């Protein structure tokens, strides 16, 4: 992989310990008048980013380790670690990271003096963990070892399964915290590995012990806990239960009914100093949990992996609306036959998924008062998910988009997407872990003025990003954001946020695509 380094003397310092970058953040503040007029004030803030270069020895504990996603990502990482290969009818295959933005995407770093645009791997800009070096563990309500669970999932080619079987057969999930009130009753048949605790607080204590043992056994510096288990029903967030950290802890101690298993895992993770990622639709990340995470100085990330239909939708609707074309009606239909689909066949669990898939349009609709004037409704939008066992992990997504176009015209776009659900989700798990680990190593401070960044006495203390790590919204269907800040669902905007923050870490300006060097002849020689 090529080395990428910002030229010295441009506000960036590379040491063995850290990359320190002075950065001018140009933004705006807007005032809206009662008559609709808008006044925009440009603002420049002077920041200093510090990125620790030493990647932490990191483990990830997967909740739902024995499911399709958990076994697929574990098997894939073992294939990379042991450099496995496997034969298919089209030839011999090697392990890859297709679908991972950190491992398989590139980003522009600018133009050469000959006006050639240069792209580099995203992972080349700052030190990122090698996914094959992650230590994997976790919990599952099924006690089947990971090798047999991989075979049960029926996702990977049989020859690859056979090649990896011996690497996985001694991996066993820990007993899970399980409450049938929060998942479909049809999940009871595979629940043979349940934690034998008397109450919810005892479950939290056991989960904390599991995390400590995992960390100590594997000599880990960081542990990230990630939910990739079945979708829970929505919890009713109750004042006095979910609203503050202290209320939440007290509610768990008194065994409150409306505390879901996912909240127990998140609480245990946070209290053990681990960031928590919610890869499912349920509303785990209540106000009390976020306050608890802030208190312990860790991140929470959510909600729900954005892997297939919703990723396409968030990109396509953004594209059409940016073109001034009005979405009027969107009908989305899915069928799949894996255990995720089996669980979602229950109405309460489907409702959780419907909410996260349905909210993807909200901010884009509200952003365009020309297409959707105040008081008008957004596009008609419905979502259907059906369980058909025959198709297994090969999910079908069918979408019909209806648009209004120029002078009363109409346009219809129909998509049929066949994809293996877990092969799209597994790379997202990798990215969520890689980027969360990176953000553990990034701190930032604000300077008093443009020249103050060399004057340590005038700098406030370095701090991490906000507890709710909204930077990772690109990877999630229903991105959680800090309270009082806007939700962004547009796929391109989400992706650009990640890339531009990475650029900031090495002192580069945001990639705004102006490319004035190409449009103003007198700028062609600048920087030569």
From Swiss-Prot:
This is Inositol-3-phosphate synthase. One of its GO terms (cellular component) is cytosol. Gene3D superfamilies: Dihydrodipicolinate Reductase, domain 2, NAD(P)-binding Rossmann-like Domain. GO terms for molecular function: inositol-3-phosphate synthase activity. It is an enzyme of class 5 (isomerase). SUPFAM superfamilies: Glyceraldehyde-3-phosphate dehydrogenase-like, C-terminal domain, NAD(P)-binding Rossmann-fold domains. Its EC number is 5.5.1.4. Belongs to the myo-inositol 1-phosphate synthase family. NAD(+) binds at residues 66-69, 140, 187, 190, 228-231, 279, 304, 307, 338-340, 353, 392-393, 421-422. Its main location: cytoplasm. It holds the Pfam family Inos-1-P_synth. Pathway: Polyol metabolism; myo-inositol biosynthesis; myo-inositol from D-glucose 6-phosphate: step 1/2. Activated by ammonium ions. Disruption phenotype: Inviable in the bloodstream form; viability is not restored by addition of extracellular myo-inositol. Levels of glycosylphosphatidylinositol (GPI) glycolipids are decreased. Its cofactor is NAD(+). PANTHER family: MYO-INOSITOL-1 PHOSPHATE SYNTHASE. The keyword Cytoplasm applies. It catalyses: D-glucose 6-phosphate = 1D-myo-inositol 3-phosphate.
């Amino acid at each position: 992989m090529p080395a990428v380094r910002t030229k010295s003397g441009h506000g960036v310092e590379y040491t063995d310990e850290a990359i320190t970058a002075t950065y001018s953040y140009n933004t705006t503040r807007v005032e809206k008048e009662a008559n609709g007029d808008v006044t925009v004030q440009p603002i420049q803030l002077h920041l200093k980013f510090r990125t620790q270069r030493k990647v932490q020895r990191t483990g990830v504990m997967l909740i739902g380790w024995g499911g399709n996603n958990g076994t697929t990502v574990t098997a894939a990482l073992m294939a990379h670690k042991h450099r496995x290969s496997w034969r298919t009818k089209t030839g011999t295959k090697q392990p890859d990271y297709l679908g991972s933005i950190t491992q398989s995407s590139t980003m522009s770093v600018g133009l050469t003096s000959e006006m050639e645009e240069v792209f580099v791997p995203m992972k080349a800009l700052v030190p990122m963990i090698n996914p094959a070096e992650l230590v994997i563990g976790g919990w599952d309500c099924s006690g089947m070892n990971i090798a047999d669970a991989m075979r049960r999932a029926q996702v990977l080619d049989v020859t690859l399964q056979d090649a990896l079987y011996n690497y996985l057969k001694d991996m066993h999930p820990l007993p899970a915290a399980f409450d049938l009130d929060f998942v479909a009753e049809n999940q009871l048949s595979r629940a043979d590995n349940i934690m034998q605790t008397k109450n919810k607080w005892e479950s939290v204590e056991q989960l904390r012990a599991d995390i400590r043992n995992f960390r100590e056994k594997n000599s880990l510096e960081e542990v990230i806990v990630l939910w990739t288990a079945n979708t829970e029903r929505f919890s009713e967030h109750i004042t006095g239960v979910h609203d503050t950290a202290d209320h939440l802890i007290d509610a768990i101690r008194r065994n409150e009914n409306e505390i879901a298993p996912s909240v127990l895992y998140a609480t245990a993770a946070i209290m053990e100093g681990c960031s928590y990622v919610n890869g499912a639709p349920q509303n785990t990340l209540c106000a009390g949990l976020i306050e608890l995470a802030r208190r312990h100085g860790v991140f929470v990330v959510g909600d729900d992996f954005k892997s297939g239909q919703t990723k396409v939708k968030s990109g396509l609707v953004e594209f059409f609306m940016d073109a001034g074309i009005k979405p009027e009606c969107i009908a989305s239909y899915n069928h799949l036959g894996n255990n995720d689909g089996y669980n979602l066949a229950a109405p309460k669990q489907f409702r959780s998924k419907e909410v996260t898939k349905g909210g993807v349009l909200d901010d884009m609709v509200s952003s365009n008062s020309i297409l959707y004037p105040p008081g008008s409704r957004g596009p008609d939008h419905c979502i259907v998910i059906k369980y058909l066992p025959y198709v297994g992990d090969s999910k079908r997504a069918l979408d019909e988009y209806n648009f209004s176009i120029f002078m009363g015209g109409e346009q219809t776009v129909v998509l049929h997407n066949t994809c293996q659900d877990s092969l799209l989700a597994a790379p997202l798990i990798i990215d969520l872990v890689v980027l969360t680990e990176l953000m553990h190593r990034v701190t930032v401070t604000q300077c008093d003025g443009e020249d103050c960044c060399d004057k340590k006495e005038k700098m406030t203390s370095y701090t991490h990003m906000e507890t709710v790590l909204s930077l990772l919204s690109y990877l999630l269907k229903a991105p959680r954001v800090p309270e009082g800040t806007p939700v962004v669902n547009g796929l391109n905007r989400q992706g650009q946020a990640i890339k531009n923050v990475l650029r900031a870490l090495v002192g580069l300006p945001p990639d705004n695509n102006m490319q004035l060097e190409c449009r103003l002849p007198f700028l062609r020689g600048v920087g030569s």
